[in-house]
């Protein structure tokens, strides 16, 4: 390895005034782009550079104008068994297109879900009946599952479902799915923007649209948090109890982070907390290192979601472990805010145990001001939970992005990007890197040892320019993955398809054709691209869902299908933040 400077000067790029900071050691990278081969990313002996993507077609659905798209990464799946993949594209309506761009099915806006579809839809056979299901969440507390039957979509029996709670019918902004209890059926977790006193933000549904209730559990498992006391209740857990507040941006992941065989539901909140729920709805206990400092509940244990996370590890040690010194003050120290911070689950250090990865914005001052985005890796509760919710060794000092330009109160559009952590091996040994688009205008790659490996400034000096979640795929069959993402802003022709090498070098920066005005929401690509071989010819298509002009499809000549470690939003069509580095 060879040291390489990063930052605005070294990269000759425009970025925010503050520089990013590394974690455990100096910023390093692999200048030759070397990456060890793994079973999930094999070479097809490709020997030519990545070819420039070729635009194929645009789709708008059942009308001449395009509905507004949000963060719902398209789903690419063979619905009818013909060897070609269809495109599931949620806007306000939900469209299904074939590989050639023809509209096959439409669920119109407000038919079953209200308003926009913000989060990526889950695409899976939920109940194992051989029929593909598509699950989408809307506003007004609505969630719907559809079945693909007889060449079209129909509402699945038992659906739509409701996420109404404590007098609010909020928007579903996050969705992830997985077989939580190992019975062969897939549960769907939905997180909402509920802010009511006593309101629940996390709902888990069975394939039949009913709230999930694991066998043998005597208390109502979901939704959470609840207002019950005693066994299975949240109101008096560890004495103090717990409550949540608003999940605003794809705030849910799923994965096994403890000693049993069941998967946990990982949720981040707008109250500076991150929680891990077991399948029965109860919370995972944090390590004994963390105890309550409040005089009323002094030395009581804490669950994952019962304490604010602070950026400085010494602050957390003094406050939650030693119980010494002044209580933390937001005016002088940064806390971690998880407002729109999707969690992913993966084995970062290669020890065979999963960690939780998130990129909260680190805030300070009153009113709160983001100082940067903190790449965070927390250990699970394996081995009896002795290090549960603690920082992975080497990650005590969190790698931090540059400071984004503050936005004025009420400046909502275009919306900030969602800092979803992509966890995949792009450099060096088989341990994964963390790649993410950050709202300081840069894409970051952070190594498993908490080193910032490289950054690429996608904004190039343009104000209020953001990027989608990236995807990681090999586009020239050499077994070395590329990074693919889109950009958006409010400016004319802000939408671009960008492709980087695994070392962060720009390969292509392509303005999208036929861009619109975005209706004041945004212009370009807010949702993660999706990449697959749509038409069965052995080469890959890149599918982009846009704010302003529908769905664009590009083909990449000379590409292959043997290395697609993170090909769609949140890693897979279950949208649960799992990739090849996840340990089942």
Predicted regions mapped to residue ranges:
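Ser/Thr-rich, Pro/Gly/Ala-heavy low-complexity intrinsically disordered linkers and tails
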Residues: 1-36
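Extracytoplasmic/lumenal domain signature
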Residues: 30-584
């Amino acid at each position: 390895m060879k040291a390489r400077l990063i930052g605005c000067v070294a990269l000759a790029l425009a970025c925010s005034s503050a520089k990013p900071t590394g974690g455990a050691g100096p910023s390093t990278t692999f200048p030759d782009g070397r990456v060890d081969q793994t079973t999930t990313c094999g070479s097809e002996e490709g020997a030519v550079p990545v070819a420039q993507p070729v635009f194929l077609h645009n789709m708008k659905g059942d009308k001449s104008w395009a509905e507004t798209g949000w963060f719902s990464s398209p789903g690419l799946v063979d619905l009818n068994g013909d060897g070609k993949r269809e495109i599931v594209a949620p806007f306000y309506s939900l469209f299904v297109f074939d590989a050639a761009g023809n509209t096959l099915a439409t669920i119109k806006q407000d038919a079953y879900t209200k308003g926009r579809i913000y989060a990526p839809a889950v695409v899976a056979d939920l109940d194992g009946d051989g029929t593909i299901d598509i699950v989408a969440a809307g506003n007004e507390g609505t969630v719907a599952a559809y079945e693909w039957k007889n060449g079209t979509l129909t509402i699945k029996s038992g659906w739509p479902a409701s996420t109404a709670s404590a007098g609010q019918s909020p928007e579903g902004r996050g969705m992830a799915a997985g077989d939580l209890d190992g019975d062969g059926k897939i549960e769907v977790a939905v997180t909402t923007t509920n802010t009511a006193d006593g309101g629940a933000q996390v709902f888990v549904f069975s394939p039949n649209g009913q709230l999930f209730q694991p066998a043998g559990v005597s208390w109502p498992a979901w939704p959470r948090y609840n207002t019950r006391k005693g066994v299975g209740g949240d109101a008096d857990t560890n004495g103090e109890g717990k409550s949540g507040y608003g999940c605003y941006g794809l705030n849910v992941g799923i994965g096994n982070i403890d000693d049993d065989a069941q998967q946990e539901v990982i949720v981040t909140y707008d109250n500076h907390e991150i929680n891990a729920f077991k399948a029965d709805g109860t919370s995972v206990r944090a390590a004994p290192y963390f105890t309550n400092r409040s005089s009323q509940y002094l030395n009581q244990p804490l669950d994952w979601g019962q304490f604010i996370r602070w950026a400085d590890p010494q602050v957390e040690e003094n406050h939650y472990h030693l119980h010494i010194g002044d209580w933390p003050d937001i005016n002088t120290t940064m806390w971690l805010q998880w407002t729109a911070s999707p969690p992913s689950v993966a084995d970062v250090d290669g020890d065979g145990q999963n960690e939780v990865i998130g990129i909260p914005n680190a805030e300070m001052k009153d009113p709160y001001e983001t100082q940067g985005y903190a790449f965070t890796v927390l250990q699970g509760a394996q081995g009896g939970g002795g290090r549960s919710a603690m920082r992975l060794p080497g990650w005590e000092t969190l790698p931090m992005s540059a400071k984004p330009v503050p936005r004025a109160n009420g400046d909502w559009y275009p919306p900030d990007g969602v800092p979803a952590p992509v966890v995949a091996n792009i450099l060096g040994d088989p341990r994964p890197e963390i790649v993410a688009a950050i709202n300081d205008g840069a894409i970051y790659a952070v190594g498993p040892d908490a080193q910032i490996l490289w950054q690429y400034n996608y904004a190039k000096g343009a104000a209020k320019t953001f990027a989608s979640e990236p995807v990681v795929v090999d586009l020239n069959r050499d077994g070395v993955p590329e990074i693919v993402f889109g950009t958006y802003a409010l400016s004319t022709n802000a939408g671009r398809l960008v492709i980087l090498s695994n070392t962060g070098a720009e390969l292509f920066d392509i303005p999208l054709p036929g861009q619109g005005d975005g209706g004041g929401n945004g212009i370009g690509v807010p949702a993660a691209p999706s990449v697959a071989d749509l038409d069965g010819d052995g080469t890959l298509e890149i599918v982009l869902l846009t704010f302003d002009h529908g769905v664009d499809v590009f083909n990449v000549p000379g590409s292959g299908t043997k290395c697609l470690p993170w090909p769609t939003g949140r890693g897979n069509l279950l949208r649960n933040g799992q990739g090849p580095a996840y340990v089942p």
